[in-house]
Amino acid sequence: MSWYSVDSEIESLERRHAGHHHTVNIKYGYVILALSIVHMVLSISGKKLYFKNWAETGRASSWWRSVVSIPFWVSTLVWLAIFAFLSIFHIEELSENYTTAVKRLGRMAYCLVPFTIFISLRPPNTVGYQSGYYLEKLNLHKWISRLIFATAIGHGLGFLYKWTKEGALAEKIFKFDNFLGVTVFALMPVLIFASVNVMRRRNYRLFYILHNVTLWMFVVLIAFHARPGVPLLAVINLALLGYQIYQRFFKSYYLHDISVVESPYSKMQIIRIPRPETFPSYLPGSHIRLGYSATNISAWLYATHPFTIASTNDDSESTLDLVMNKPVNFPIDITSPYTMTGPFPSLPPQFYTTARHVNIICGGSGISFGLPIYKYFVNSNRSIPIRLIWCIRSSDDTFILDHLLPERSIDVQIYITSNTGSLNQQQSASTIFDEEADALLEGDSTTNIEMANLATDKEEKKTDHFNTIHDGRPNFDDAFGNLAAAVDVDEKWLIACGPRKLIDDCRKWTKGKDIEFYSELYEM
């Protein structure tokens, strides 16, 4: 072998490995894994300390809340900065050694997958609520997933550029281990496009199927594609996905004998589920998730659907009552079996033991969230001021209270925002939260419960249920006047559940009034 050929071979190796051993990128993957573990530990520990401080002091600390409620976009930007820094760290002459950075991007993306799966887990009836509300992590899960996919796409584009430059594109693409990566790479732009709000809401089922197929292919195929291998990460990812399947199908309750209560002129209906004997105690405002039986192919293709439990945890309650609208995209067939997971709490236990003045406003099917909280405080021995306001489009919907609030001594303020009562003018409103909660949701859109540009209180009358009924929208200064006037009371709360317009207006009203605010979004 000539000295020229030896020098050429050495130069070739230097170009491939940038002067480092080919395993140099392994440590950067473990750095990402370690940082994600730190993120999880700090998040859970912060929640525990926040709730501990709340229980000990009797009030929710605004400082602790700011610590544990870091906006998802801040966390996403931090992770983006970490990826940007590590991807080029300690790489000299990047233009020549860009393949080292490209390889590193792929490894870092795969090593962040356990984190995004972990924050999407839904542990039911979390003891003491100590880990917080799983839906609080929803936006972070969504954007971290997008960061992973964008990074993986960058990895794929880098190698496509390299192979094209070398004139070996066709040869390299169809090499087995490369082809596994190319297959996943081809799915990712499609999923990102399908995840855009407009597309996702137009066909959530398609998005959900694409999401799961891409995730499983990413976890499994990249385990065989990666060089050097990622056996530990693959085991962690598969274990977390296996836990999700276990919770959904093997820790769920199988339901039969579901009944429906409805009124011919209302678009709302009550679904009554016999309470399973082993169903645990739950806090007011908790929700369950309904799905199809495991023997139904739909159970494996489509998401479960979240519904707030409109009934209370009282021992006399033999059913779990849900409020939903008809028709819905998850129609209930009383002759078919279903599965149920949960309960999942929303507000922490400390709220129920420390709140001293509470007002609740609900829009449409949001009554399923506000009503059990209202009943809890009315029936408790604490005797705190409590008020419930319900905004609906039709007086026909008040039949809900005849079944869920039989106590005739309890007064609920009802605002009817439309005089028509026409069934055709009411839109579907059945479940809770955003559809990103892994459910195909339909909700009270801002055109359903008109909260703006309507005349205020025009007429007042009594029903035989002792509920005060108003025509028009509520004037917040009047409706919540008792809350604002209680200047010497700590732990004043306004709870809003309904469409985004209602929630945004309520949040603005609380500004500068020393009033705690909590909301649940019921929207498609």
Swiss-Prot record:
Topology versus the membrane: Multi-pass membrane protein
Domain Ferric oxidoreductase: 105-222
Organism of origin: Scheffersomyces stipitis (strain ATCC 58785 / CBS 6054 / NBRC 10063 / NRRL Y-11545)
Enzyme Commission (EC) number: 1.16.1.-
TM helices/strands, residue ranges: 24-44, 69-89, 104-121, 143-163, 179-199, 206-226, 230-250
Molecular function per GO: ferric-chelate reductase activity
Pfam families in the cross-refs: FAD_binding_8 (PF08022), Ferric_reduct (PF01794), NAD_binding_6 (PF08030)
Residue ranges annotated for the FAD-binding FR-type domain, each copy included: 248-372
Enzyme class: oxidoreductase
Gene3D superfamilies for the chain: Nucleotide-binding domain of ferredoxin-NADP reductase (FNR) module
The family this protein is said to belong to: Belongs to the ferric reductase (FRE) family. AIM14 subfamily.
Name under which the protein is recorded: Probable metalloreductase AIM14
